[in-house]
A protein has these predicted regions:
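Active-site-proximal substrate-binding core of FAD-dependent oxidoreductases
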Residues: 213-222
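Hydrophobic, well-ordered secondary-structure elements that form the walls
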Residues: 37, 98, 126, 185, ...
Length: 222
């Protein structure tokens, strides 16, 4: 919804004062650095899902949301699909992606120059912790930065999860599934009710499925 209301709808005469204040004062979620890679080495002891916390976790969050700079002591989520589906990688090899919270594009970080350096940092951190030896075993890798989220996925400021889920932007205060100001405009996704993440996004689709079922067929659903 934020990108639609701010950039895609050209005529904004239906926006009242309070709605304009709402869309202009929103706080946005972190950005994401997502690194996909294969490995010539298999890591059988690594689970499907792993969360690794850096030593200065609170400082990392402060750099993301307040200072809007990159941290050299990162926390990350590591996904190993081949742990439960062996077809995700050739025999004796492995497949991963690692997701690292970073500042969104309000930071003005130049990812064209910082991307490779940050990838090397991520590799070093994994090599020192969960995936020893990974630096010498990476194959077929690529990464996504907040620029991808902003340019390809049209998320405002390259945020990974749309608006922040703080109290003043949650529940009724979140963008509604049925637009408050534009007739026949409806939303599903991370920025609308009930919230971000796969469960929230799918739930937003279920909300509209129920709504349209009642609207089109004039019947109540359970």
């Amino acid at each position: 919804p934020p990108n639609v209301y701010k950039n895609l709808i050209k005529s904004k005469e239906k926006y009242n004062f309070f709605f304009k204040q709402k869309i202009n004062r929103m706080d946005y979620s972190m950005g994401l650095f997502v690194y996909y890679f294969g490995s010539k080495k298999q890591y059988k002891n690594v689970a499907h899902h792993t969360i690794y916390f850096g030593k200065s976790y609170k400082e990392h969050l402060d750099k993301i949301f307040e200072k809007k700079i990159l941290s050299d002591d990162i926390s990350y989520y590591l996904h190993r699909p081949s742990a439960t589906d062996s077809s995700m990688a050739p025999d004796g090899q492995d497949a991963f992606y690692v997701l690292v919270p970073v500042p969104n594009n309000l930071s003005n970080i130049n990812w064209s120059t910082e991307g490779e350096k940050f990838k090397d940092l991520v590799l070093n951190k994994m090599d020192e912790s969960v995936l020893p030896g990974i630096k010498n075993n990476v194959i077929n890798d690529f990464y996504l930065t907040p620029n991808y989220f902003e340019k390809d996925l049209s998320t405002l400021h390259g945020s990974g999860f749309s608006i922040q889920p703080k109290f003043s932007q949650s529940a009724y205060f979140r963008f509604h599934n049925k637009s408050e100001v534009i007739k026949n405009l409806y939303f599903v996704g991370a920025g609308t009710h009930p919230g971000a993440g796969m469960p929230g996004v799918l739930s937003s689709a279920k909300v509209l499925d129920k709504f349209f079922n009642e609207l089109l067929f004039n019947k109540k659903t359970c």
